[in-house]
Swiss-Prot record:
Membrane-spanning segments: 27-49
Gene source species: Atropa belladonna (Belladonna)
GO CC field: chloroplast thylakoid membrane; proton-transporting ATP synthase complex
Membership in a protein family: Belongs to the ATPase B chain family.
Protein name: ATP synthase subunit b, chloroplastic
Predominant location category: plastid
Topological type in the membrane: Single-pass membrane protein
InterPro entries: ATP_synth_b/b'su_bac/chlpt
GO molecular function: proton-transporting ATP synthase activity, rotational mechanism
Protein localization: Plastid, Chloroplast thylakoid membrane
Function: F(1)F(0) ATP synthase produces ATP from ADP in the presence of a proton or sodium gradient. F-type ATPases consist of two structural domains, F(1) containing the extramembraneous catalytic core and F(0) containing the membrane proton channel, linked together by a central stalk and a peripheral stalk. During catalysis, ATP synthesis in the catalytic domain of F(1) is coupled via a rotary mechanism of the central stalk subunits to proton translocation.
Misc: In plastids the F-type ATPase is also known as CF(1)CF(0).
Lineage: Eukaryota, Viridiplantae, Streptophyta, Embryophyta, Tracheophyta
Length: 184
């Protein structure tokens, strides 16, 4: 293992005339090339991103529609429960002497169960919307990253020749070996 590490370290000590390094001078890093690369990424990624967002929007809208349908069903159930409640209330009035407390408990249980059902449906709708939004955001991030990576790799591959590739790879391996020794 030490021999492998030594070989990486020796690769990292090239003469500075032919090696790569980080240039922190913003004026020397050629911001025009960076802006061209970003412009190409934005130009080509815009259509894909737009289509992806439209698809996600449709899915979210469909989910919202489904949730609204569930909500309407819950409202219908609530109306049925209210009509049953009215019926129970009229019966309670008739049988007040015989079992007022029993009927009152049934009424409260019916109301509580109806409200719990509505709360559960509302929570389900909100969770579904939140889940779909998060999934859409994650997919957009992944697509944008993939497009940027493809564009950057394409630009790098078109600009670098084999010798430059080998020198860059060797320099990076040397830097990684040096960083590994520092962390060890």
């Amino acid at each position: 293992m030490k021999n492998v590490t030594d070989s990486f370290v020796s690769l990292g000590h090239w003469p500075s005339a032919g090696s790569f390094g980080f240039n922190t001078d913003i004026l020397a890093t050629n911001p025009i090339n960076l802006s061209v690369v970003l412009g190409v990424l934005i130009f080509f990624g815009k259509g894909v991103l737009s289509d992806l967002l439209d698809n996600r929007k449709q899915r979210i809208l469909n989910t919202i529609r489904n949730s609204e349908e569930l909500r309407e069903g819950a409202i219908e159930q609530l109306e049925k429960a209210r009509s049953r409640l009215r019926k129970v209330e009229t019966e309670a009035e008739q049988f007040r002497v015989n079992g007022y407390s029993e009927i009152e408990r049934e009424k409260l249980n019916l109301i509580n169960s109806t409200y719990k059902t509505l709360e559960q449906l509302e929570n389900y709708k909100n969770e579904t919307i939140q889940f779909e939004q998060q999934r859409a955001i994650n997919q957009v991030r992944q697509r944008v990253f993939q497009q940027a990576l493809r564009g950057a790799l394409g630009t790098l591959n078109s600009c670098l020749n084999n010798e430059l590739h080998l020198r860059t790879i060797s320099a990076n391996i040397g830097m990684l070996g040096t960083m590994k020794e520092i962390t060890d």
